[in-house]
Structures are given as C-alpha cells and as structure tokens.
C-alpha cells in the first residue's frame, strides 16, 4: 500500500470515529501511526485531505466488485462517465436475476459489516459537501461511477432507460444502507431479508419480477 493510501485510510477511520471536527492532519498521523507532519506532507490543505479521502473511498468500493466482462454500454449513462472495466454485478432480470440479487446483497452486507466504517466516513463527507462545492463535485463523480456500473448491467438486460433505472436503484440502496447504519430503525436485516429486499427493489425499479 502506498503512503498516500495509508494516510487516506487513516482519514476514513478518523472520520468514522471522531467525525468531521476530529479530522485534522495530526489526528490522521496518530491514526496511521506515522510521524507528525506526514499527512500534511502529502496533503497540504484540509481540502486536499478530504479530496484524497473521497477518492480512496471510491477506490475501496471498486475493489468490492469483482470484474465482469461482456457488458455493452447503455443508452443513457450519466454524463461524463464511461463504462468502467469493473462492474461486479451479473446481469439483472432477463438474464440472471438471482445472481444479480445475490451479488448486490453480498456487497451491501459487506458495507453494513466490515465496510461500516467507510459508510460512516461517507456520511460525514456528504454533509460537509453541502457546504463545500469542490468536495461535492468529487462525491458526485464517485457516485456516477457506481451508477454507470449498474446502468451497464441494466442496458445489457434490455431494461428501458437503464441510466435512470440505475440511479433509482442506487438511491434506494443508499437509503437502505443509511437506515441500517445511522437511521432511527432498530431492525437489523438478516442475509435472507436483505436478499428479499433487494429482489423486490430490483423488480420494482426495472418492472420485471
């Protein structure tokens, strides 16, 4: 792992533990177990550190998704995004609904458990981005990549308006994640419930059961 990535990982941990107020260069140095001044050497400003953290979150998310091939581009992808080489999710209804559901459920479950820290950091960054347009831009770009991944799968399955349907699907999943991690609800979804919820969501969004 590179030193900048190590520092960004420490920033993620710091955000999840101490929130935005607790994110300082010195706090990140301590979290990374590095000499004081290390974080500021690579990321001179707070904005640079935040930007690196957003980019690292996107990189870690992409590693959760194993490569999938043979998926043609869709017809209404988010502007400015191509079809990433890593899609991770098999084709949805019309090709393999169960495989898509299982893969999506595995990813979401991992983000609720081993990846929970990342989600907490993401929520901190999302709130901060409402006051920092430059940070908002980085988060939007990261989200567009995920939506393009799903849209490519929907397009391959012949779903109409794959970009819009993918945006809806990802938005609903974001809501599910937030409810489980930071929402007021206390019910924790089992793997079976998670699979059922995603299956129902997929059918509703694509119009295919």
PLM features: residue spans?
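Short, basic, alpha-helical segments at the C-terminal edge of helix-turn-helix-like DNA-binding modules
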Residues: 55-61
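Short, solvent-exposed amphipathic helices
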Residues: 138-145, 149
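Residues in soluble alpha-helical coiled-coils and helical-bundle/repeat scaffolds
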Residues: 44-48, 113, 130, 134, ...
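Hydrophobic alpha-helical connector segments
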Residues: 65-119, 166-169
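Hydrophobic/aromatic-rich alpha-helical bundle segments in the mid-to-C-terminal region
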Residues: 135-136, 140, 155-209
């Amino acid at each position: 792992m590179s030193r900048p990535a190590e520092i960004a990982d420490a920033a993620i941990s710091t955000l999840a533990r101490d929130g935005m107020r607790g994110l300082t260069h010195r706090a990140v140095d301590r979290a990374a177990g590095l000499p004081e001044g290390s974080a500021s050497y690579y990321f001179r400003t707070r904005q640079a550190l935040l930007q690196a953290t957003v980019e690292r979150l996107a990189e870690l998310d992409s590693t959760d998704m194993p490569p999938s091939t043979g998926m043609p581009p869709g017809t209404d992808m988010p502007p400015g995004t191509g079809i990433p080489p890593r899609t991770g999710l098999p084709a949805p209804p019309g090709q393999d609904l169960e495989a898509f559901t299982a893969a999506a459920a595995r990813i979401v479950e991992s983000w609720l458990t081993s990846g929970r820290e990342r989600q907490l950091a993401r929520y901190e960054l999302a709130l901060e981005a409402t006051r920092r347009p430059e940070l908002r831009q980085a988060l939007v770009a990261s989200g567009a990549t995920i939506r393009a991944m799903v849209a490519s799968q929907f397009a391959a399955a012949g779903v109409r308006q794959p970009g819009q349907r993918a945006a809806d699907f990802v938005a609903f999943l974001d809501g599910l994640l937030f409810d489980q991690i930071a929402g007021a609800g206390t019910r924790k979804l089992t793997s079976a419930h998670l699979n059922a919820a995603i299956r129902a969501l997929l059918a509703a969004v694509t119009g295919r059961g």
